[in-house]
Amino acid sequence: MRRAQERTRRNVPGRYWPRLHDLQGHDQIRWVVDLLRARPWTTSAWISLTIPGEPADGLPCLTALSFRIRGYRLIMTAMFRSQNVHRAYLAYIPLREVQLRVSDELGLPAGPLRVFVDVPHVHVADAERVASVLAAVPEPNAA
């Protein structure tokens, strides 16, 4: 368990780190914490990871994060424009770490991490592996 946590902490910076902490000179995560701390009645903050006018081939798959305080817990929602559903689920681990860091700064427990993917897809090269995973899943109402 400890090794997994250390790996997660090392991987959190990853490719989204600059967009979270230095998007055109703005630390968006710091902004979220400061906003929710200064105006707790607000109960929500959104950040975008896109830059207006950036080339289409440079757009990140993760486009936005929403932070909401509900029931004295911090709920985070991640919005992906596209995602390889076979290989990308491990990206949720660093997202949870972002949520835990923000909730810790706010002195709140973390609530659920919600993820929305607009265009889920599977690469053709992964089709056989995906089929074997799906074949191993039992039918919901099978006796």
Question: Can you annotate each of these PLM segments?
Answer:
Residues 1-143:
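Terminal, non-catalytic protein-protein interaction segments that mediate quaternary/complex assembly
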